[in-house]
Amino acid sequence: MGFLKIGDRAAGAIKSGGTTRRAAKMVICDADHPDIEEFINWKVKEEQKVASIVAGSKMHEQRLNEIFSAIRQWDGSSEDAVDPTKNSPLKTAIRQAKKVAIPETYVKRVLDYAKQGYASIEFPTYDTDWDSEAYASVSGQNSNNSIRVTDSFLKAVQDDADWELIRRTDGSVAKTIKARKLW
């Protein structure tokens, strides 16, 4: 898998012609390869990273600016506006930020910025567009990843039979799993 990840980065550096963003690279893994389970899950995990980047960036933007909003709406002294023990809406906004795992360092940064007179923060947000920075930051996006299945594999799926994953170095069985589980 390490080699595939390196190849994926290299393919990303060499864009194919035309309007598509994908490089002209195809990766095929045999259904009986010892790394087949990891290969299948590789792209799924990378897609989950994109979802986390997108959701996390938008959550940061929202919650950090809610802290600024609580400070701006304060009608008491300016020193007390940034003190959550005196500014109840600020305390609530900070709690909400912590509830969704906004790091303490970012909350402190917003409070420090507010003390300097800033009224909002621009936190970079990402989207799920294929050409977005979020997708560019994960691996497995620069190739057509496919699995080579054989008639014997399909028969094993149909029969709910065991399926052997074969080491390429010596031909021995690395692991036995249910074909349907892999399917």
Regions found by a protein language model. Give the residues of each.
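Active-site cavity-forming subdomains of large catalytic enzyme subunits
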Residues: 1-183
